[in-house]
Each structure stands twice: as structure tokens, then as C-alpha cells.
A protein has these predicted regions:
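Structured surface patches comprising rigid loops and adjacent beta-strands/short helices at the edges
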Residues: 99-107
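A glycine-rich, Thr/Ser-enriched phosphate-binding loop motif common to dinucleotide/cofactor-binding enzymes
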Residues: 112-117
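Glycine-rich beta-strand-centered segment in the early N-terminal region that forms part
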Residues: 21-38, 50-92, 99, 111
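A local structural motif
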Residues: 12-19
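Short hydrophobic "strand-cap" motifs at the C-terminus of beta-strands
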Residues: 6
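Extreme N-terminal starter segment of soluble prokaryotic enzymes
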Residues: 1-2
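Cytochrome P450 core scaffold surrounding the K-helix E-X-X-R motif
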Residues: 42-48
Length: 117
């Protein structure tokens, strides 16, 4: 899969689009095929190293998004493959897929546009 990657704290123009390993859901986690991701002011600060939270590099920015569940880990009870969800995570939404806790994903109607969710 591909993701936008921050390799060093720098302007957003230094972000790169590159191949990374597909995420694998662990217990209580789901993998979401990302259809839309929100861009927030903190994302701009984080990639420049100006935010109080600074993840280890390299990382994919993006706090939130929506998509379709493509796999579930052991003990997942709240979501199933094929569910449309909105999700929140500290970073990682600027990718084709993301793994999130099932508790941080919320069902949305399949008829609801992902870019609005």
C-alpha cells in the first residue's frame, strides 16, 4: 500500500508518497481501507516538529478519516468486514489503509459520503 510519509520534521512540501507495509489488525483492532482523511491545523504543526506531540519518524500524518473495514483482529465485536466507519487515531490516516482500535471507529451509513464523514 502507499502512504504519505514524514521522514523528518520539515515543511509539508518534504512529505513523500511511498510504498509501506500493509497494516495487520491485532486483537481488538480493525484495518480500514481509507476513503477520505481530514486535514487539521495540528497535522501541519506535527510534520514541522512544532506541536507538543511529536511521533517517531518516519510516520504518516492524519488524525481522522473514514473508510471501509477490510479485516478484523481477534475479539473484535463492534465491526465487521465491509462496514463503513469514521475513525480517529493520533496519526496514520494519510494512507491507503490504517489499523485502529475498534473502539475508535464509529459506524456510518453506507449511503453517507466518506468525504463528509
Amino acid at each position: 500500500m502507499k502512504a504519505i510519509i514524514c521522514k523528518k520534521f520539515a515543511p509539508v512540501s518534504d512529505l513523500v508518497w511511498e510504498e509501506v507495509a500493509d497494516p495487520i489488525a491485532g486483537p481488538g483492532e480493525i484495518v480500514v481501507d481509507v476513503k477520505a482523511a481530514g486535514l487539521n491545523y495540528p497535522d501541519n504543526l506535527i510534520v514541522r516538529g512544532l506541536y507538543q506531540f511529536q511521533p517517531e519518524r518516519p510516520f504518516s500524518p492524519g488524525h481522522e478519516g473514514s473508510g471501509v473495514v477490510s479485516s478484523v483482529g481477534a475479539d473484535v465485536k463492534m465491526h465487521s468486514v465491509g462496514d463503513s466507519v469514521a475513525f480517529f487515531k493520533g496519526f496514520g490516516a494519510f494512507a491507503e489503509k490504517i489499523v485502529v482500535s475498534e473502539r475508535m471507529a464509529f459506524p456510518i451509513p453506507k449511503s453517507f459520503p466518506h468525504k463528509i464523514a
